[in-house]
Amino acid sequence: MNPAGTVPTLVHGKRVLTESTPMCEYIDAVFDGPKLMPADPAARYRVREWCRRTDMAAAALSVLGWHSFLGPMLKQKSEEELDRLIARIPLKERRIAWSAAAKSTFTEEQLDDARAKVGAWAAEMNRQLARTPYLAGETYTLADLVAFANFWGLPRTVPEYANAERTPHYLSWLRHMHARPASIRLFQASRSLGQMALGLGAELQEAA
């Protein structure tokens, strides 16, 4: 259903939505509940700017995710199963990425570059969170939700960059985000990654 061969995909009535961040804004606008997009145009711009920057930063994180999580999972499949799975992906660059993850063809230079880029983004979030309690200002918005969805695990993924000494404000925000009831319900409903997230959340609370 998604021409890019990625997830998520949302079907709502006759609409098919395939871009995750615009999808979040659509859900916020269409469904009932506390609104995550501010009414003020300037404030709304700041939220969208942070969402866009988060999406761009997530590209480096995906390399680490493919290497650490997707690769080991795909290695459990036979070569024939893997070839069939990859052949179903419509975009060539996504097929190449999945193949690289499955065969562990990321070089140490590529992995180090990805870690450095993710670490730079952690530092950028930390600088903003030193000024305001949330990424786009004084209130919780879609910017925080999108950033947390992508970067909830940096103390585990890049501990050399995301730690109490280098990014204390990011860790304080992360602790708050992990403790939100919606986050806990989501992770409890998830499988292995959910359990990992719950464990990290508990560690953050203990370290507070």
Give the role of each language-model region:
Residues V47, D144-L145, R180:
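Short, thiol/selenol-centered motifs that function as redox-active sites or metal-ligating centers
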Residues P159, A164-A208:
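Long, positively charged, glycine-interspersed low-complexity recognition regions
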Residues M1-L91, T105, L204, A208:
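GST-like domain detector, emphasizing the conserved glutathione-binding G-site
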Residues D28, A147, G194-M196:
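Short secondary-structure boundary/hinge segments and terminal tails
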Residues A58-R175:
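GST-like fold's C-terminal all-alpha helical module
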